[in-house]
Amino acid sequence: AINGAWVDQLSFTEVEVNRVASSDLLGLFIGAVLTSFAIGSWSRQNLTYLGIALSITANGLCIHYVDYETTLILRFVAGLGAGFYTAVAVAGLGAHSKPREAFNWMLLAFAISQFLELQLIPHLSMNGIYLFFIATYVVTLPFVRLIPATNPPSATQDTPTESRRPTLLA
C-alpha cells in the first residue's frame, strides 16, 4: 500500500520505490542482527526504546523530507528501529512460559494489524501514512515497562545436566 503512495504522491519511479522498500527491509534485517548480539548484555527495554525512538524519528522526518535520497536513508533508519523492536519481541516469545501460545497471539496480532493497515493506508495521504506508523509505536510505549529488562534464566541453567530430558524432534 505504501509503495503505491510513493509512486502516486511522491512521484517516485518503480525502481526508486523498490530501492526504498529494500532499504527499509535491509534496516529491519540489520537491526534484528544487531539486537541478537546486544540482547544478552543490553536491557531489553532499552533496546525496545531505541527501536521506537529510531522509527518515530525517521518516520517523522519522512514527513518533512520527501526527496528520494533522503527518503532512502530515512526508511533504512526506520527499518533499523523496527528491527530492534521486532527482535526483542521475538526473543520475548522464546522466553515466555508458553512460547507456542505467545507465538500464536503474536501471529493473530500481526494478522489484525495487517488487515487494518490494508484497510486504512489507501485512504491516507503520505503524511498520514507516516503519522499512522508513528502512532503504532506510540501506543506500545506504556507496555515497554512490562518487558523484563534482562534475560530470564533458562531451564538449562537451573537443571542439572543428568536430570534433563532429551528434546523431541518433530
PLM features: residue spans?
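C-terminal membrane-cytosol helix-exit motif in multi-pass small-molecule transporters
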Residues: L118-P122, M126, I134-T156
